[in-house]
Regions:
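Short, small-residue-biased leader/transition segments that mark boundaries at the very start
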Residues: 2-9
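Short loop-to-alpha-helix "cap/lid" segments that border enzyme active sites
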Residues: 34, 42-182
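Alpha-helix boundary/capping residues
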Residues: 22-25, 39, 96
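Glycine/small-residue-rich loop that forms an oxyanion/phosphate-binding "nest" at active or ligand-binding sites
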Residues: 16-30
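Short, basic/glycine-rich phosphate-binding loops at helix/coil junctions
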Residues: 10-19, 41-50
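Short, charged beta->alpha transition segments
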Residues: 29-39
């Protein structure tokens, strides 16, 4: 049996504390820069989630540092940003290069509000689209992309595919590939 442990990481955690942590596989927790340098060696599209911080000023500082690091490493064209924080969403839109996809995760804004903000679209929990199935078409009509998370049941995958969703986040990628192929 695997040893289970929990880590509590806050926006006040220091880099020294975080990089001293060992992951379950024995590796050190990498810094964002180390992670991005490793990702640079691949062709993978990158999606970076910024967790909400305790204060807006901390989020702005985090967004500035992230956007600058991504630029320094030449990864702007492969990067997308997601966050539950409305403030951080607006900051990514303001500070990232024009056209960088920024998706809002919280499920509280309509397609029209997202479009007006400059978002690439919603990245909402499946239940939001079950309550508002019309939002998928509204997003597409506005030129937005749509992602649903975390979708693990075949019937939910099928429903979203039938609604022409653009992206699905899942813990069951093989099952999803089968549903897409059906």
């Amino acid at each position: 049996s695997r040893r289970q442990r929990q880590m509590c990481i806050r926006d006040s955690s220091t880099a020294a504390t975080l990089t001293s942590l060992k992951l379950d596989n024995g590796e050190q927790l990498p810094t964002l820069e180390q992670y991005l340098k490793a990702a640079k060696k691949t062709k993978t599209q990158l999606i970076l989630e910024l967790k909400a911080h305790s204060r807006p000023e901390r989020e702005t500082l985090a967004v500035e540092k992230i956007v600058n690091m991504v630029k320094k490493l030449g990864l702007e064209k492969r990067m997308e940003y997601i966050t539950f924080s409305l403030h951080a969403t607006k900051e990514f839109i303001r500070l990232a290069p024009a056209g960088t996809p920024v998706f809002y995760l919280d499920g509280k804004l309509t397609p029209k509000e997202l479009k007006e903000m400059g978002c690439a679209g919603p990245d909402y929990h499946l239940s939001v689209f079950q309550r508002h199935p019309e939002w998928i078409k509204e997003c597409h009509d506005l030129g937005l992309k749509v992602n649903a998370w975390t979708v693990n049941k075949p019937k939910d995958m099928k429903w979203l595919i039938e609604k022409n969703i653009d992206f699905i986040t899942t813990n069951e990628p093989i099952l999803l590939q089968e549903k897409v192929s059906d």
